[in-house]
Amino acid sequence: MREIISIHIGQAGAQVGNACWELYCLEHGINPDGQMPSDKSVGGGDDAFNTFFSETSSGKHVPRAIYLDLEPTVIDEIRTGTYRQLFHPEQLITGKEDAANNYARGHYTVGKEIVDLCLDRVRKLADQCSGLQGFLVFHSVGGGTGSGFGSLLLERLSVDYGKKSKLDFCVYPSPQVSTAVVEPYNSVLSTHGLLEHTDVAFMLDNEAIYDLCKKSLDIDRPSYANLNRLVAQVISSLTTSLRFDGALNVDINEFQTNLVPYPRIHFMLASYAPVISAEKAFHEQLSVAELTNTVFEPSSMMAKCDPRHGKYMACCLMYRGDVVPKDVTAAVAVIKTKRTIQFVDWCPTGFKCGINYQAPSVVPGGDLAKVQRALCMISNTTAIAEVFSRIDHKFDLMYAKRAFVHWYVGEGMEEGEFSEAREDLAALEKDYEEVGAETVGDDEAEEEM
């Protein structure tokens, strides 16, 4: 088996996690109490969904997941909510005091006390796996727990499980919408850790997803639940081929192989189609070609950045539902002829496609329509550097005056870490610039050597 352990950190991680597990349960026909009427092999069994769920001898399906937060309120909602019987109580770990939007609290003071307990629970889950494939980690980089504790845990996972892939879903601060004044500090410090300790990071930002919900689903005031259900569809599409059988399956390691040209350049942009409400879907059904065009639209991106300003290095297209390889080939051929979609000159093909016959499920009473086919695109583009330069700029404005820095130093952090992290991000922006630059002719390159 190729099992995967999901780790949900902080409020953002936990709430995205709730939406994901709600959707996985629906897709596999697992009830909120963990029973699965359709599953004939009770206790164990080698079904495809066992990558995400372990089975007990009584036929209960338990998510291979851990929730961690430094304060209890968000996870208490799971302990009392609809899915309270789904998770093992030991999988929900909470501290008593929160990280107060402070990276240093999450990483040094408060986080230190709880990290060994968390790693112990991770080890227990890992011991139940016959062939652990990797980790999916969910967190935000703007808060204190997600940024500080998130990077602490990733560092420790690198030590204990060096060879396993770590895929990271991180919610980045939006350009306009901010939830904390010190977001830029936390994000820069956290990204510094993500650069080293994750294999692939998927960037999400609330503002981009708000706009998607508003525009495509006609929700006037989207709530986090609306956003998270959309994110859950993306994450579900990424993991479908791990949980169901399909025509072109995509393994977790294949993401890395196909999307990451250089180890540091591993920040991905995600987009998803069709995002349509039930009323609209009644009148239209999107073809493979239309879906393929839609995911390349800047308005479909899950992070605020315009791919037309950069070049693509690689794209992963995951189709699901009623899709045949012939249609996919035709759709990709059309995309390749478009002038607006530019690839770097050293990566001429750049497409990896996956097809899965499992049609997308939707949460009953949710906003998304039930459709026959859907497409999720993960792309590695130089445009994502926009996200970093935005955060860096805000960081510089505050750090020039050393505003709020005493809160971090007071929690045992050294001021040097700020400049170290900031320099690392400056180098990252430069890396993206170089990757997108035109390759010089061989003769010139040799002269420069």
Swiss-Prot record:
Example of a GO biological process term: microtubule-based process
Coiled coil: none
Binding positions for GTP per the UniProt entry: 11, 71, 140, 144-145, 179, 206, 228
PTM comment text: Acetylation of alpha chains at Lys-40 stabilizes microtubules and affects affinity and processivity of microtubule motors. This modification has a role in multiple cellular functions, ranging from cell motility, cell cycle progression or cell differentiation to intracellular trafficking and signaling.
Cofactor(s) needed for function: Mg(2+)
Reaction equation(s) it catalyzes: GTP + H2O = GDP + phosphate + H(+)
Nucleotide-binding as UniProt keyword: yes
Location of the active site: 254
Localization (cell): Cytoplasm, Cytoskeleton, Spindle; Nucleus
Signal sequence region: none
Any one GO molecular function term: hydrolase activity
Sorted UniProt keywords: Acetylation, Cytoplasm, Cytoskeleton, GTP-binding, Hydrolase, Magnesium, Metal-binding, Microtubule, Nucleotide-binding, Nucleus
Residue numbers of N6-acetyllysine PTMs: 40
GO CC terms: cytoplasm; microtubule; nucleus; spindle
Residues annotated as binding Mg(2+): 71
EC number annotated for this UniProt entry: 3.6.5.-
Family from the record: Belongs to the tubulin family.
Protein role: Tubulin is the major constituent of microtubules, a cylinder consisting of laterally associated linear protofilaments composed of alpha- and beta-tubulin heterodimers. Microtubules grow by the addition of GTP-tubulin dimers to the microtubule end, where a stabilizing cap forms. Below the cap, tubulin dimers are in GDP-bound state, owing to GTPase activity of alpha-tubulin.
Other remarks on this protein: The source of this protein was the multinucleated Plasmodium of the slime mold. At least two alpha tubulin genes are expressed in the plasmodium.
Assembly mode: Dimer of alpha and beta chains. A typical microtubule is a hollow water-filled tube with an outer diameter of 25 nm and an inner diameter of 15 nM. Alpha-beta heterodimers associate head-to-tail to form protofilaments running lengthwise along the microtubule wall with the beta-tubulin subunit facing the microtubule plus end conferring a structural polarity. Microtubules usually have 13 protofilaments but different protofilament numbers can be found in some organisms and specialized cells.
Protein name: Tubulin alpha-1B chain
Species classification: Eukaryota, Amoebozoa, Evosea, Eumycetozoa, Myxogastria
Gene transcribed to yield this protein: ALTBN
